[in-house]
């Protein structure tokens, strides 16, 4: 042993490895109002006790490392360390546990989702002592929430900008998603908007490819917006995807959209990254643009029940980072989505205060302290027969987005848009008259078909279409 090492040992530094639970498992800890709280689904390797696994998560996502280091003595671990303060079993899963971890607020940079996630969902997810790890929920304290701008505008400001109230908004993703020229793309946008939709949308992978450069697309879509507005007397929009290979290029595209006078742009927030998304959100607030968010890549992160991150966490992160709309599944369409879980994170997107409710997957009470809300977007494999269920599930503060369910109409895009608008108006009127959409939905649609040939044709085309597959990511305790 060198003299230097002997000196360190003689003043209290004890080298070596000790169990994480001796430092980071603190069941007596009382959480603070300023703590960020996390609920992890932990699957320990065989032979690893749940207390050690939970403590390892707390350590490796905060101040700990695999061995004792002498620099621990140069700071206050009690002030900065994460703490596993409670562990509970998962019903029906012998090898899984929910570990609750509290993080001191000083561990995180203000206004940075990037920094928060780098710690909480960083290297710890590759830790060998864990067979699997999933972040189920986060409690963001008001003290941290107040360091974020959040959505550029929010639900009420968007409705005021669009002058549209008392119903869900209607959208359509232009198909085929790739391969159209800019002029043909703009024509498809125009037909949908003049038929009665509020919005059309770039698909998430439409950026600036050889068949359609972004500037050309923006110009033809702006022409479609202005022409359809003049004909219908309604404010229209198209989600112009500003996502690009660099933040500088992304902002350049948003600037051009603003110069064209269009109301909304779009970003792929997971593939683009949280830093880019927050930058774009700030630009949109400063320049009066709404911001639509697509969640491409989310299922890589959130679909498996025992590893990754639940979408409710990604939804909370988006509300902090900023976006006025975000795709949130449909429950009834072609994409994965458990009903109760979906309703839970839809409330987390829209409401100012959400109580803990484990029956909907909400582990913590969340106070958003007046941070603007986000409109959930229902999109993916939906058509006119789904309209009653969508209206009942998502309510007025939502965007119902039909891609193939508009463009697949046998008579073309505009009649497809008419069919969706008629179906929506019929459902809203029936609901306002006190009818039960869950029970009478099909009857309501059939009645509307009698005076709308466009809706009748759509109903005939999609009458047999179902996406009846079991949900992979169910809430605990569901069969």
UniProtKB/Swiss-Prot annotation:
List of residues binding Mg(2+): 201, 203-204
Swiss-Prot/TrEMBL site (Transition state stabilizer) positions: 334
Co-factor requirement: Mg(2+)
EC top class, as a word: lyase
GO annotation terms (biological process): photorespiration; reductive pentose-phosphate cycle
Modification after translation, per record: The disulfide bond which can form in the large chain dimeric partners within the hexadecamer appears to be associated with oxidative stress and protein turnover.
Modified residues annotated as Phosphoserine in this record: 208
Localization of this protein: Plastid, Chloroplast
Keyword Nucleus: no
Modified residues (N6-carboxylysine): 201
Reactions that this protein is recorded to catalyse: 2 (2R)-3-phosphoglycerate + 2 H(+) = D-ribulose 1,5-bisphosphate + CO2 + H2O; D-ribulose 1,5-bisphosphate + O2 = 2-phosphoglycolate + (2R)-3-phosphoglycerate + 2 H(+)
Function: RuBisCO catalyzes two reactions: the carboxylation of D-ribulose 1,5-bisphosphate, the primary event in carbon dioxide fixation, as well as the oxidative fragmentation of the pentose substrate in the photorespiration process. Both reactions occur simultaneously and in competition at the same active site.
Additional notes on this entry: The basic functional RuBisCO is composed of a large chain homodimer in a 'head-to-tail' conformation. In form I RuBisCO this homodimer is arranged in a barrel-like tetramer with the small subunits forming a tetrameric 'cap' on each end of the 'barrel'.
Subunit structure: Heterohexadecamer of 8 large chains and 8 small chains; disulfide-linked. The disulfide link is formed within the large subunit homodimers.
HAMAP family, sorted: RuBisCO_L_type1 (MF_01338)
Similarity comment: Belongs to the RuBisCO large chain family. Type I subfamily.
Name the UniProt record assigns to this protein: Ribulose bisphosphate carboxylase large chain
Organism: Draba nemorosa
Lineage, highest ranks first: Eukaryota, Viridiplantae, Streptophyta, Embryophyta, Tracheophyta
Gene coding for it: rbcL
């Amino acid at each position: 042993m060198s003299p230097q090492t002997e000196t360190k040992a003689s003043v209290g530094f004890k080298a070596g490895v000790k169990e994480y639970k001796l430092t980071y498992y603190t069941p007596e800890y009382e959480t603070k109002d300023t703590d960020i709280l996390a609920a992890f689904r932990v699957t320990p390797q065989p032979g690893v006790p749940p207390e050690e696994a939970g403590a390892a998560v707390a350590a490796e996502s905060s101040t700990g490392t695999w061995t004792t280091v002498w620099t621990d003595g140069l700071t206050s671990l009690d002030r900065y360390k994460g703490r596993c303060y409670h562990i509970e079993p998962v019903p029906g899963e012998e090898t899984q546990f929910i570990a609750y971890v509290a993080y001191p607020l000083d561990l995180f940079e203000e206004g940075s989702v990037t920094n928060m996630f780098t710690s909480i969902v960083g290297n710890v997810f590759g830790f060998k002592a864990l067979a699997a790890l999933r972040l189920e929920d986060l409690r963001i304290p008001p003290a941290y929430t107040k360091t974020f701008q959040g959505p550029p505008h929010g639900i009420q400001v968007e409705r005021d900008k669009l002058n549209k109230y008392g119903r869900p908004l209607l959208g359509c993703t232009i198909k085929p998603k790739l391969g159209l020229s800019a002029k043909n793309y703009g024509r498809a946008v125009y037909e949908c908007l003049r038929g009665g939709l509020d919005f059309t949308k770039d698909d998430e992978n439409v950026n600036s490819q050889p068949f359609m450069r972004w500037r050309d697309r923006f110009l033809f879509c702006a022409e479609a917006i202005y022409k359809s507005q003049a004909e219908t007397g309604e404010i229209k929009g198209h989600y112009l995807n500003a996502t690009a290979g660099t933040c500088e290029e992304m902002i350049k595209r948003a600037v051009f959209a603003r110069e064209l006078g269009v109301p909304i742009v779009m970003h792929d927030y997971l593939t683009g990254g949280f830093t880019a998304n927050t930058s774009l959100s700030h630009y949109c607030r400063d320049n009066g643009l709404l911001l639509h968010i697509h969640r491409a890549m989310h299922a890589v992160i959130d679909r498996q029940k025992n590893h990754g991150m639940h979408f409710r966490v990604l939804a909370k992160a988006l509300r902090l980072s900023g976006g006025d709309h975000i795709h949130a599944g449909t429950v009834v369409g072609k994409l994965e989505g458990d009903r109760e879980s979906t309703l839970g994170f839809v409330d987390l997107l829209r409401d100012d205060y959400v109580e803990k409710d484990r029956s909907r997957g909400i582990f913590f009470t969340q106070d958003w302290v007046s941070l603007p809300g986000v409109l959930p977007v229902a999109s993916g494999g939906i058509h006119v027969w789904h309209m009653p269920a969508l209206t009942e599930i998502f309510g007025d503060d939502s965007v119902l987005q039909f891609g193939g369910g508009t463009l697949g109409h046998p008579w073309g895009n505009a009649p497809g848009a008419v069919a969706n608008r008629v179906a929506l108006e019929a459902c809203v009127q029936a609901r306002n008259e006190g009818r039960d959409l869950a029970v009478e939905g099909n009857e309501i649609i059939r009645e509307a078909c009698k005076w709308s040939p466009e809706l009748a044709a759509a109903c005939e085309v999609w009458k047999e279409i179902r996406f009846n597959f079991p949900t992979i990511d169910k809430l605990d305790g569901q069969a």
